[in-house]
């Protein structure tokens, strides 16, 4: 809540008519819950790949700033975050953590065509295993990678049969375990 609080306060001081939209992960929407109830709310659990925003309760000071300066809060799913991550990596050759791409993931929901929009992308606090996992999950969700298991009889040539079937489907084998 601290990042949007500061940005919203500064932006509204410069231009009071600017629209400020906050974005939270669906699995950790503590600010949205607080705004809807007009009081701090402690979520029973949080579950999101955006670990930097995975808080059960927003802080009191950010909550006050959000009530005063933020016009709307939307949520995005972990799937939408993975899609945004993959877009950022493939099209722009950039890496940002899940919490840092919430605004990018929300752009499709906000109907921003032909509008001046600032989407803040921040934070590169990710280890290589998380990066690899996010890329693989994104490719799987887009149908670009398929993972499957098959039990083959212990007869010579069976792997060749599977390889031939994959070739007929114009598929590529990335790895065999």
PLM regions: where:
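Short secondary-structure transition/capping segments
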Residues: 18, 71-72, 166-171
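Glycine-rich phosphate/pyrophosphate-binding loop at beta-loop-alpha junctions
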Residues: 2-68, 108-114, 118-153, 163
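Active-site-adjacent helical/loop segments in soluble small-molecule enzymes
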Residues: 59-115, 174
